[in-house]
Amino acid sequence: MGGKYKKQWACVTLFSLITAALCGACGNVMTGASGNVPETEAAGQVQPDGDLPAWQTYADDPVTLDWYINYSWFSTPWGENLVSQTITEETGVDIHFITPLGNESEKLNALIASDSLPDLITLGWWEPQVSEMTENGMVYALNELADSYDPYFWEVSDPVAVNWYTTDNGNIYAYPNSSITPQDVEQCEDLSSNQTFLVRKDIYEAIGSPDMTTPEGFCAAVKKAAEMFPEVDGEPLIPIGAHVFDNEGNVSFDKYLMNFLAIPWEKDGVYYDRYTDPEYFRWLKVFRQLGEEGYLANDIFVDTRTQMEEKVAQGRYFCMLYQYSDMLTQQKILYANDPDSIYMAVEGPRNANGDDPLRPTTTINGWTVTLISKNCKHPERAIAFLDYLMSEHAQLLTYLGVEGVTYDIKDGKPVLRDNIKQILDTDRAAYDREYGADDAYWMLQDNVMQLQWKQEPSPATAQLEEWGRKYVVYNGQYDVVFDSGSKEASEEDKITKLWSQTLPALLMAPSEEEFDTLFEEFIEKRDELGYTDVMEKKTAYMNSAKEKLGIQ
């Protein structure tokens, strides 16, 4: 049964009409080169049985594939835990992971420039290298590999995602994980957004569980928390936490804050300039004022992700706009030490009207995409391996592990064993080393399909997961990535870099007058860099995407 129909089962029902509406879909707007499926080295090997998924035929024919993961933080090894060993046993495929040691873009660009891309490549769907690799003929067309070596692809892939990622030449080169459609959001009550406003539970309750939705309430709460709890276990309290500052800005202080303030993505059929919205401007000034008074610690401007995760695990932050899914491991550490020291989700900053926040889940684009390089000597094994990972069998394996070892079937449903749940809830690193389920290998995860096996949440994370289902919206029609090398891509890159330099300067501005001057300079420079042209192109893309997604 195909991946799409598994989604329908999990969500009660999904609309099939979107499949037809997405034919010739836009996705990442790129043309692409022909796949040119080669004669492979499989000539002397076992050939797949047309009646079976190819991975079953290849199980006794070992091969190693190199897989580049474009995230320096990814460190789960292959071959040492139950899930990866089971996958290798079932498919014959051993994996050698390659990850960047430093800057992700520099590493991937070097691989592209030297024509040394490994067999498989996984990166964010929005990254410019996706279109670069496609347009330069560096990756195979997945549909051509499927037709030549493994038609099982058409059974396990989601036709909506396939249509969305199909390029103008009729080929699909990249397949997403975590792909969610507007209909999924409408029909699946358990879908959530991981964008949350978090507070440390014991501190928040000690200061009276205040309303932090207004600037006045927010400032008062931050100041009272810092006054009552200047230190946490001998270390200074960090009143306000955030994601890391990077070459795009800081999602906590831009995109997430805008979403909590319910700032729209469009107005009157035109892509909206969220950065100049009065509500966003007002709240940025709130944070600037707090910074002037000493409540924005230097740590948040310089810390790496690893450093921040360490401080979350120590409970050093009072509050933060943060993706709760990025701190579940640290949350469980806090819970094990003191259940009252965990973070809880509460109502965060709101606009002057008190409107509900707009909390997006992932979209039809997904999170990452995976491609097969033309350097791959065994593309027939690569496509069969991806098809395996898309299947319901592998989704259950990568999510819950192996029946009889990590879970049992009770009343027709898989249930994690108590000892497995205990280690998962208390020591994620040890769990990954020994078992490697719970989407440790997330590259082809299907969140909607996995809803049918959803387990009772850990008491450490239950409140976060429950709150995450509030105010969920779909915003994939606004996800725009211009073709690598295009005029618009160059203009937007320069504007984004300018914003990444401006945002910390705004927050650290010594006065409101300096803030205003910096912001005016940003707007002026942004216009000079081609902002009007970029927004016109985004509006055109948005309207096209809405039509193809069936969104009014």
What is the role of each PLM region?
Residues 2-12:
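Bacterial N-terminal signal peptides that target proteins for export
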Residues 11, 26-217, 249-255, 263-266, ...:
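Conserved N-terminal structural module of periplasmic/extracytoplasmic solute-binding proteins
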Residues 21-25:
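C-terminal motif of bacterial Sec signal peptides marking the signal peptidase cleavage site
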Residues 61-65, 91-95, 115-119, 138-140, ...:
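Loop/turn elements at helix/coil->beta-strand transitions in domains of secreted/extracellular proteins
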Residues 72, 131-132, 243-266, 288-443:
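Extracytoplasmic/periplasmic substrate-binding proteins
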Residues 143, 171, 176-248, 266-311, ...:
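Helix-loop-helix "hinge/cap" segment bordering the ligand-binding cleft or interdomain interface
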Residues 388, 392-510:
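Conserved small-residue motifs centered on glycine
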